[in-house]
UniProtKB/Swiss-Prot annotation:
<keyword id="KW-0963">Cytoplasm</keyword>
<feature type="site" description="Important for acyl-CoA specificity">
    <location>
        <position position="111"/>
    </location>
</feature>
<dbReference type="GO" id="GO:0005737">
    <property type="term" value="C:cytoplasm"/>
</dbReference>
<comment type="similarity">
    <text>Belongs to the MetA family.</text>
</comment>
<keyword id="KW-0012">Acyltransferase</keyword>
<feature type="active site" description="Proton acceptor">
    <location>
        <position position="234"/>
    </location>
</feature>
<comment type="function">
    <text>Transfers an acetyl group from acetyl-CoA to L-homoserine, forming acetyl-L-homoserine. Utilizes a ping-pong kinetic mechanism in which the acetyl group of acetyl-CoA is initially transferred to the enzyme to form an acetyl-enzyme intermediate before subsequent transfer to homoserine to form the final product, O-acetylhomoserine. Has weak activity with succinyl-CoA as the acyl donor.</text>
</comment>
<dbReference type="Pfam" id="PF04204">
    <property type="entry name" value="HTS"/>
</dbReference>
<feature type="binding site">
    <location>
        <position position="248"/>
    </location>
    <ligand>
        <name>substrate</name>
    </ligand>
</feature>
<feature type="active site" description="Acyl-thioester intermediate">
    <location>
        <position position="142"/>
    </location>
</feature>
<keyword id="KW-0808">Transferase</keyword>
<dbReference type="InterPro" id="IPR005697">
    <property type="entry name" value="HST_MetA"/>
</dbReference>
<protein>
    <recommendedName>
        <fullName>Homoserine O-acetyltransferase</fullName>
        <ecNumber>2.3.1.31</ecNumber>
    </recommendedName>
</protein>
<feature type="binding site">
    <location>
        <position position="191"/>
    </location>
    <ligand>
        <name>substrate</name>
    </ligand>
</feature>
<dbReference type="GO" id="GO:0019281">
    <property type="term" value="P:L-methionine biosynthetic process from homoserine via O-succinyl-L-homoserine and cystathionine"/>
</dbReference>
<feature type="binding site">
    <location>
        <position position="163"/>
    </location>
    <ligand>
        <name>substrate</name>
    </ligand>
</feature>
<feature type="site" description="Important for substrate specificity">
    <location>
        <position position="191"/>
    </location>
</feature>
Amino acid sequence: MPINVPSGLPAVKVLAKEGIFVMTEKRAIHQDIRPLEILILNLMPDKIKTEIQLLRLLGNTPLQVNVTLLYTETHKPKHTPIEHILKFYTTFSAVKDRKFDGFIITGAPVELLPFEEVDYWEELTEIMEWSRHNVYSTMFICWAAQAGLYYFYGIPKYELPQKLSGVYKHRVAKDSVLFRGHDDFFWAPHSRYTEVKKEDIDKVPELEILAESDEAGVYVVANKSERQIFVTGHPEYDRYTLRDEYYRDIGRNLKVPIPANYFPNDDPTKTPILTWWSHAHLFFSNWLNYCIYQKTPYRLEDIH
């Protein structure tokens, strides 16, 4: 089934070439079934690339999805043309009276700052608080996962000795519909300077660790109802994202490691090995199907 996005969004052409069925708003209104309403707060610098990555995963399911793109009013994007933002994005002020089946909050390159020093932190906390009763299931990715765990449960983040970058082997730690169809072990990308610790999460009765890695630590945490899902890695990343970040970092003279388990023979001149794609697609499909579609009320106004 298709994903419904605003007409003219650049991601449409890219995804159409990949065989992902993207439906325009005009065509979608003639469908009789109720689509899932998904909100995406895009905090990543390259918003267009992140749109493509997330829509690719949301569009590869049997469910029709309407996507609303959100940006922060208290932080003006510097790496995405303002024309793109004004055309395709909306603000929290414009959607706070609506309800959504699902919500994705992306990562952001601010993890070395204390949460309260992030310039849009106050706005983000307002949005996260709103999500409690106006969204059926919210997925927090990378820095957003750390921010959500801190805001809702008081779990701190800790700075790592060096950047964690690469693709790491994970194991399913607890049965969950999110990992239905997964093997016991799977691979997933990480790209971060900070972490949350297992022992802090274990102290919170409402939370469960669903997947983890010996090298990368905690990967997926959820509350008991799976209406809050915290993903510390980047399953949405495409083949070249870690490579592009690595070249960006060394171009800034940063001392970062070569992404682990990524380049053949750890040679950055070679094409990266894609080992997490099946996990990413299945994980997002399970979220849409089991955590949202099969549980969300038919009437959006009944979400609370």
